[in-house]
Amino acid sequence: MKSDLWYFLLFCFQVEALTGEINDSTKSEMFTFHDGGVQILCKFNAIVSQYKMELLKGTEVLCDLTTTKENGNTVSKNPKFCQSQSSSDGVSFFLYNLDSSHASYYACQLSIFDPPPFQRKNISREYLNVYESQTCCQLKFWLPIGCAAFVVVYIFGCIFLCWLTKKKYRSSVHDPNSEYMFMAAVNTAKKPGLTGVTHNLELCGTQA
């Protein structure tokens, strides 16, 4: 049951890729959905032997990939945060576990080391809008309230149950038909007056 709830919360986060122009309704070529995350494709057609591709969120470098095509060596920065993969048409970065704080402009910055001269340029830049659905926002608002209400009701239920149990026990003790009633002590000693009366009756019978 708990796993189903977590899956539902994860699906509440919806990611929508938008271009830099607000009125542009064309499909984004930079962002695509991939295994619950977003694939950011940085395309370039230059023939280079060694280059570095950096993924920028605003002005912050999230991760980069350096490739030497002669040796086939690649070095990726921050592999835990984002994964990278080089291909014939460019470099792909994969971002996962996105939330609303990741909404920003993302840019691909290419640095060419070989062939010379050294060059650095931004080859693509688009805005990634990550928003939380209204259902998820309502759930995140009402879930703590519901949990708190459940705890309060549970505590009061336990208190009421204990009080009811004690009340039933006390009523069973004071009930005269209860098997737990204490038996009163009975005094079996004979009274002297009654004995005298008995003797007098015997004497009268003898005289007669």
UniProtKB/Swiss-Prot annotation:
Residues 1-19 form the signal peptide. Glycans are attached at residues 23, 122. Disulfide bonds join 42-108, 63-82. N-glycosylated. It is a single-pass type I membrane protein. One of its GO terms (biological process) is T follicular helper cell differentiation. It comes from the Eukaryota. GO terms for molecular function: signaling receptor activity. The keyword DNA repair does not apply. GO terms for cellular component: plasma membrane. It is found in: Cell membrane. Residues 162-208 are cytoplasmic. The keyword Glycoprotein applies. This is Inducible T-cell costimulator.
